[in-house]
Amino acid sequence: SLIDQTDKDFIWMIVDDGSDDGTRDTVQGWIAENRIRITYHTKENGGKHTAYNLAVDNCATDYMFVALDSDDFMPRDAVSEINGLLRSNPGCCGIVGLAVCDNGRKPDDIEKFNMRSMYDVLSTYDFSAETGLVIRTEYLKKFKYPVIEGEKFFTEAYTYYQMTEPFIWTNKVFRTSTYCSDGLTKNIYRLYAANPKSFYMYQKMRSEITVNFKKKLKSVISADAFYIMSGQSEKKSALARLFMPLGFLYYKYIMHKNRT
C-alpha cells in the first residue's frame, strides 16, 4: 500500500526488532528497486516501545507518521491527505487521524476534538477510537518511552497523556488493519503481570496529572496494585496510602485473572 501512494513524498522507515525470517534480504531487495525511499534499522528484541524509540531517534523528516504493523495498510491517498494538512497548518504539533478495521465497522467521529491536546481528550473523555498519528519529530523526542530491564511492553498512552499541545483532529483514515482482534484486551492481565513496573509508572503519572476525579481515583487504585506487584518501595502520596486497601484487592484480582 505504500508503493501505491499517490504522493511519494515520504520515507518508509523499517525497524527490524530481532527477526530471523530473512527480513533483511527482503528489505534490501525493496531498497534496490528504488520505487520509494526506505531506511532499514535493526535492533535486539525489546518490545514495540523500544523500536519506537529507535525510530524517533533516526527520523530524518520534520514529522513522524504513521506506525504500521505488518498486517496494516494505508489508503492510497493517506500520505497526500497528511501532507496537505501539514502544508495548510505549518508548524502544527501533529495530526490525529483514524485507524480502522477492515470489517465495515463505522469509525468514530474525532473531528469534534479539533485543536485540542491529546492530554485534554484522554483525561476528559472515555476515548476508545483507534488512531493514526502524525507528530512533529522534535516534539516526539520529549516523550520517549522508558526502558525497564526485563519488561517488553509500555502502553502508548504513557506518552500521549503528556502531550499538551493542540493537535489537528480529522476523520480521514490513515491506517487500516486487515487482521483485527481484541488480543491486547484478552491478554491484558498477562501483560500486567509481565510488566508491572511500566504499568505502575503509567498509572502513577496519570494519577498525578489527571483532573477528572473519577479517572484520577481509578489510576490511584491501579497504581497501588502495580506498586505491590512490582515490589516498589518509594514513598507514596497520602491519597495513594488512603486507597491502598482497594489497590490490594485489585492486585489480588489481577493475579487471579492471570491464573485463569
Indicate where each model-derived feature is located.
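Catalytic core of nucleotide-sugar-dependent glycosyltransferases
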Residues: Y161, V173-Y179, N187-K214
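Short beta-strand/loop segment that forms part of the nucleotide-sugar
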Residues: F10-G18, T39-K43, L68
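Short beta-strand-to-loop acidic/aromatic patch adjacent to the donor-nucleotide binding site
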Residues: D62-F73
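Conserved nucleotide-sugar donor-binding catalytic segment
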Residues: D108-Y189
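Conserved donor NDP-sugar-binding/catalytic core segment of glycosyltransferases
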Residues: D77-D109
